[in-house]
Amino acid sequence: METAQLLIDISKLTEGERIEMRKLGILTNDNELRDYKFPSIHAERPPIEKFAVHAPQVLNEAYNYQKPSSFSRALRLELGGYKILIVSGTASVNEEGKPEYIGDFKAQLWRTFRNLTNLLTAESMSWHDVVRTTCYLRDIERDYVEFNKIRTTFYNWLQLDPLPASTGIQVRLCWESLLVEIELYAIAKIN
């Protein structure tokens, strides 16, 4: 890997960063970038295959945004005849990576459900395959009642039974303009 590919300037690392990066094997004792070597344990046991999932009609990968982030929007794992979809926290963001419906919690929640639905559809899955959600609200005291009304309305419309397991948490989301974000896990048999 060339230094130019890094997002950090090695010459400006703190001593603590250098120590930890050496212990991780990223830097040599001379503070030079070490070439990455694939772990030998994977010669005997290959890592599980992971596939990035895309729904570009409604949102793009986070690393393609104007302010990029280093994570996949969603991953599909295949295990013993089942596929598992793991979706990162998803919010009311459009295909250009810009927040939609600033200040309108209810519209943001519906857009979030649309983005999640499109990610599920991209993998031939539906909300009936969802087993768990984690729901992040910027202001849980102000917005939870409306959140639960909309979520219940959506789930009832979908005729979900049983409902996915879920946890609700109040957090500061990545952008001040975002009021709600949801991550989910879905499991389905591979046809």
Language-model features and meaning:
Residues 1-114, 118-123, 128-131, 138-191:
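N-terminal presequence-like segments and the immediate start of the first folded domain
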